[in-house]
Amino acid sequence: MSAGAPVAPRAASPQLALTRAPRRGLLVALLAALLATGSLVAAPAPASAAGIKVAIVVGPAGSLTSSYLRSARGYAAQARSYGATVAEVYTPNATWARVRAAVQGANLLIYLGHGNGFPNPYNATLTPLKVDGFGLNGSLSSGNVRTTYFGEYYVRTQVKLAPNAVVILNHLCYSTGSSEPGNPTPTPTVARQRVDNFTAGFLRTGAQAVFATLGEASYLIDSLFTSDQALLDIFWNAPDRTWAYRISFPSARTPGMTAVMDPKAPGTYHRSVVGNLSMTAATWRS
């Protein structure tokens, strides 16, 4: 064939044309069968957070205040991204009156600030008016340094959360069993008592579980809104879990509830949860 001579288009092979048609028909038939039997199912849509209330409280924490406020605003944005309603009460205007009003009926309560727990180096007996609750502003615009404590008594007598509510205590001394910076490492017995005591008031508000962590809490929020996991599984799926030094015990302060602690190392208490740990995130959302 000479260069430049026109080339006639090649006719499709009859065998190829006959082969393609049956294959196309087979694929269509297979797809129809899968749809009919339910074998081909679309991925589930994200759970709706309509009607879920999240309350976030930040108390005065001195030099740590700005960091806690930044974390709190991030948690608020995260909760709103799922469709939840968010109430925020932040220092220097986080008085007890404002906090008490904001947290009523919350499905999720998150508190960041100073923690005052028991046992501690200052008191021989538990003082419910001052320990195991919130550290807040004593008056409006009282600043970000001075802390007024509203303890377990105020929580259990004046707060009513939604049924099956969850509480997250974030960055609080004592709440995970830890001591204040510079104080001696607690014994395992003292650490367990601190965890059990700090959760007791909150578990009398309608809450089914109280998580405490000295690290980020965003994974807890995400799991509550997007998974169907049991609360214990959510706890153990934490990105900073250790597991090797885990402690589990029945709550003495709240009979029927279980406490689990996950020390980073012996004596280093940074995560805990107390509550009805078989409850699922789906139940929390319902």
Q: What is the meaning of each model-derived region?
A:
Residues 3, 95, 141, 146, ...:
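Short, solvent-exposed coil/turn linker segments
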Residues 3-47:
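Secretory targeting and sorting signals
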Residues 46-50, 158-160:
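Short boundary motifs at domain starts and secondary-structure transition points
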Residues 50-139, 189, 193:
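A domain-level signal for caspase-like cysteine endopeptidase catalytic cores
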Residues 57-61, 89-93, 111-115, 170-174, ...:
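Active-site-proximal beta-strand/loop segments in catalytic clefts of secreted hydrolases
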Residues 79, 83, 106-113, 172, ...:
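Sec/Tat-exported extracytoplasmic proteins
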Residues 118-207:
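Cysteine protease catalytic core and zymogen-processing segment of caspase-like enzymes
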Residues 175-286:
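Active-site-proximal C-terminal subdomain of hydrolase catalytic domains
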